[in-house]
Amino acid sequence: NPTGKEQVKMKNIRKKFRDMKYRHKLTILLVIASLVPMTVLALYSHISMSRLVRHNELEDTSSILEQTRESIDSQIEIFTSLLNYLTYSPDIEEVINEKSMDNYMAYEKYTYIVDPLLTVPKSYHDAIEQIQLFAQSIKVRHEYTLVPLSEMKQEWWCDSLTDDVQVQWMVNTEKPEIVAVRQLYNGKELEAVLCITLDYNKIFKPLNNVIVEESGGMVLDKSGNILYRREEIQENDLADKTDSQEVLEAVQKNYVSVSSISRDTGWEFYLYKTRKSIEQSVYQMLLTEI
């Protein structure tokens, strides 16, 4: 009977303790008494350090996301400024306003002045795929840069435009590509539209680069549509979720996450890590303590 053996063993230990000399008993009691506060102190230190490491991990993740979002915002600002510059370019204004230009003059103007104005920026920004001007004054398409306004309806982003003269940012995750669009009005009449098409992967590259093992990242627009999402999680319980709200609920419940909102586009950036990866950091810290 194991229980009986344990009882006999405990009786033997108690008997040996009673039979000990007083100084030996006192020594054992002093050792035990000194170990108790040391154990409590070590346990308290471990708990405090674990909390500190978790807090630092969260702070580091938040800092990484802020830097990443700022890097993407910097690109957004560059292309917004480029659109604004082109909007007020005298050559662009002349093309938009001159509706009775003969074919020869139009060809000369398009080929030697306006077309270079819309193609040269590609040499300085590798994220630019193309810049287009859609205008009522343009009767026949010239290359890919100058397009009749009526053909704008064929573009995937056309139906998403609002009646706004500010730069509008839109993302197509299927193509995938990003566009920055600015509409130009004469009173209430739409006369022209400038559009910069950008490389999706190059714009989101800063976020892609910080997604490491057991982490993920996501970008949502103001309507909650997923503009970008990627995970490097071994046991990914998010893989079958396509709705942003479902993903966010799962992330908030099972992951450590941080978020940041773009001041220019209103896009919301998320960076999240598995709790397992955070605990791994705590474990590594404990090993260094030992």
Give the ranges of each region predicted by the language model.
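Extreme N-terminal signal-anchor transmembrane helix of membrane signaling/transducer proteins, especially
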Residues: 7-51, 55, 59, 290
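Conserved beta-strands of PAS-like sensory domains
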Residues: 150-155, 173-210, 270-274
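Hydrophobic beta-strand positions
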Residues: 133, 184, 219-220
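Solvent-exposed, extracytoplasmic
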Residues: 111-125, 189-228, 232-234
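Extracytoplasmic/periplasmic sensory segments of membrane signal-transduction proteins
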Residues: 59-156
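Extracellular/periplasmic juxtamembrane segments that couple receptor/chemosensory ectodomains to their
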Residues: 222-223, 231-289
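Regulatory sensory and allosteric helical modules in signal-transduction proteins
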Residues: 156-172
